Amino acid sequence: MRSEGDTWDITTSVGSTALFVATARALEAQKPDPLAVDPYAEIFCRAVGGTAADVLDGKDPDHQLKTTDFGENFVNFQGARTRYFDNYFARTADAGVRQVVVLAAGLDSRAYRLDWPAATTIFELDQPQVLDFKREVLARAGAQPRAERREIAIDLREDWPQALRDSGFDPAKPSAWIAEGLLIYLPASAQEQLFTGIDGLAGHGSHVAVEDGAPMKPEDFETAVAEERAATAQGDQRVFFQLVYNEQCAPATEWFGNRGWTAVGTPLADYLREVGRPVPGPETEAGPMIARNTLVSAVRA
């Protein structure tokens, strides 16, 4: 379970979920018709080694990401999510935004793989050990960012708005924000603080994109946590429900809409259909998760 002030690297606690998601992106890139191609996802997996690399080589057929009930649907989910936010950044760049803020950047490689206009600055915020891992791995691979990239090593439960300003962020200029795969790891109070921080720093013409998820029924969540703990006691290394908070301060469309933003939410299931990927049914392991997920983008006039 989580604790106040807990920290992590890329192979422990919340950090390990970034590696799991990167593995899914790498598997998506292996498809003949990928929704998105992140060449650095595989580099991260091979830097860690073990099952993260084995599954890419077909050496771990029992890996969770290879199951039909969960894995195939989760890989589709990550491919679709990546495309959605990639397209979001293309739109914000076309709109003239030159400040980008990646909250809980994890193994996000958009600074390296997307085409950014000249004079774009990308601020990446995350735990120090996570940023260190990404920088070192990409440096060994000879990768160079395609925009000015500034790391801000900070926990989002701390005063990250001040740290962002100290790193050269200008609230008077338009900015584009992303909170991808983040909110579930924050209690409702911290989500509220995060949204408030964005709202306080985003000037006119700014954009924000959020992956939003409705909470599970409390009894279902408690059952999932109990089952996962029992599996952990039997040696299962997979942990998810013990890392998340089954809370929501408010739907992102509602929160930002009530503060003068024009917000549009796209249910993940609808977006999967739009990009030609199947939507898993409620009887599958991945189905309920996908049904609760909404991709949100908002703009401040």
Curated annotation (Swiss-Prot):
Keywords on record: Methyltransferase, S-adenosyl-L-methionine, Transferase
Query: What InterPro entries does this protein's entry cite?
Result: Ppm1/Ppm2/Tcmp, SAM-dependent_MTases_sf, SAM_mthyl_Trfase_ML2640-like
Keyword Methyltransferase present in the record's keywords: the answer is yes
Give binding positions for S-adenosyl-L-methionine. Answer: D126, D155, L156
GO molecular function, one example? methyltransferase activity
Q: Which GO terms describe its biological process?
A: methylation
Q: What is its EC number?
A: 2.1.1.-
Instruction: Please list which residues make up the signal peptide.
Output: none
Q: Matching PANTHER family, A to Z?
A: S-ADENOSYL-L-METHIONINE-DEPENDENT METHYLTRANSFERASE YKTD-RELATED, S-ADENOSYL-L-METHIONINE-DEPENDENT METHYLTRANSFERASES SUPERFAMILY PROTEIN
In the record, the note on similarity to other proteins reads: Belongs to the UPF0677 family.
Q: What does this protein do?
A: Exhibits S-adenosyl-L-methionine-dependent methyltransferase activity.
What name does the UniProt record give this protein?
Putative S-adenosyl-L-methionine-dependent methyltransferase MAP_3777
Q: Which organism is it from?
A: Mycolicibacterium paratuberculosis (strain ATCC BAA-968 / K-10) (Mycobacterium paratuberculosis)
